[in-house]
Amino acid sequence: MAASAAVFLRLRSGLRQGARGLCARLATPPPRAPDQAAEIGSRAGTKAQTQGPQQQRSSEGPSYAKKVALWLARLLGAGGTVSVIYIFGNNAVDENGAKIPDEFDNDPILVQQLRRTYKYFKDYRQMIIEPTSPCLLPDPLREPYYQPPYTLVLELTGVLLHPEWSLATGWRFKKRPGIETLFQQLAPLYEIVIFTSETGMTAFPLIDSVDPHGFISYRLFRDATRYMDGHHVKDISCLNRDPARVVVVDCKKEAFRLQPYNGVALRPWDGNSDDRVLLDLSAFLKTIALNGVEDVRTVLEHYALEEDPLEAFKQRQSRLEQEEQQRLAELSKSSKQNLFFSSLTSRLWPRSKQP
C-alpha cells in the first residue's frame, strides 16, 4: 500500500509539470523568421497608408454634407420668409378683387409689406388670446318674456361628461348621473349656459345629447375664453350679465381665476355611476336662488377655500338643521311649561264671574 501510494504521488507530480509546460508553450507565440516579420510590417504600413486618405475623406464627408444641409435650410428659410411677407403684406381686397386702402399705403413698399405682415400676425394672436366678443351673450329678455334671475355657467368635460376609451368602441363620453334632475330643478331659477374649453366641433353634438329637452339657453366654446398662462379662462365680465348673479361651475379653479368668488370648483368626475354630486349641486344652487341672494359672491366666498364646497355645504346644512330642531324642542318645552303654569294659576285663583 505504501509503495502504490508513492507511485501515485510521483505520477500526479509528473502530470502537473507536463500540463504547466504545455500551457506555457500555448501562451507564447511561435517564433517568426526575420523576413516573415518584415513582410508583415510592410503590409501593415501599406495598409495604414492606404487607409489614411480614406479615413480622412470619410471624416470630411459628414462635415461637407452638414454644410450643404445648412445652406439648404438657410435658403428655404429665407424663401419662406419672403413668401410670407409677400402673401400677408399685400392690401386686403374686396369682393370685386379691388385693393382696400389702409394706413400703410403712404409707406415705402418694403415697409408696407412688413407692417401689414406684423399686423396680421398680431391680430391673429389677439384672436386666439382674447374672447371673440366683449359681449358673448345677447341682452337679457324683457317682459312679456321670462328671464331667470340668475345665470349658471357649466363646464362640459369633467362636470357633466367623462371621456372614456375602449378597444371595442374607441372614444365615447359618459353622462354623469343627475343631469336631468339638475336641469329640471334649476331651469326656472337659472339661465343655464354651457361654457366649455372644448371646440365647437366637439362640444356641439355632445350638448345635444345631454339636453334633448332644450333646458340650455346658450352655448359658448373655446374661442370665447381668454387664454392666460396656458389655461382657457372664462371671463364673467364678457357675459353681458350682472356678475352678482352669475355662478360658474368648473373642475378647474383656473377657469374662473379672474372672478374667483363667482365659481364653484368640483372634483373632476371619474366616471363612477354612483356619483351624486350633481344632485348636491342642484340642492346648493336651489337654496341660493330660493333665498333670493342679492350677490352670490357673498355666499360663494365662504366656500372658495374649501377642497369640496358641496360637502362643506352639506355639513353646514346638517348643523343648521340640528340647531333648528334643538331650538324648536326648547321652544316646545317652554311653551308646555307656560301652559302648565297658566292652567295651575287659573285653578288656584279662579276669576270671579261678572254679575
From Swiss-Prot:
Topological domain spans for side Mitochondrial matrix: 45-67
Residue span, FCP1 homology domain: 145-288
GO BP: protein import into mitochondrial matrix
Keyword Phosphoprotein attributed: yes
Residue range of the transit peptide in the UniProt record, numbered on this chain: 1-44
Mitochondrial intermembrane side: 89-355
Transmembrane segment boundaries: 68-88
GO CC term (a single one): TIM23 mitochondrial import inner membrane translocase complex
Compartments in which it is found: Mitochondrion inner membrane
Keyword field: Membrane, Mitochondrion, Mitochondrion inner membrane, Phosphoprotein, Protein transport, Transit peptide, Translocation, Transmembrane, Transmembrane helix, Transport
Assembly, per entry: Component of the TIM23 complex at least composed of TIMM23, TIMM17 (TIMM17A or TIMM17B) and TIMM50; within this complex, directly interacts with TIMM23. The complex interacts with the TIMM44 component of the PAM complex and with DNAJC15.
Name of the featured protein: Mitochondrial import inner membrane translocase subunit TIM50
Species in which this protein is naturally found: Bos taurus
The gene coding this protein: TIMM50
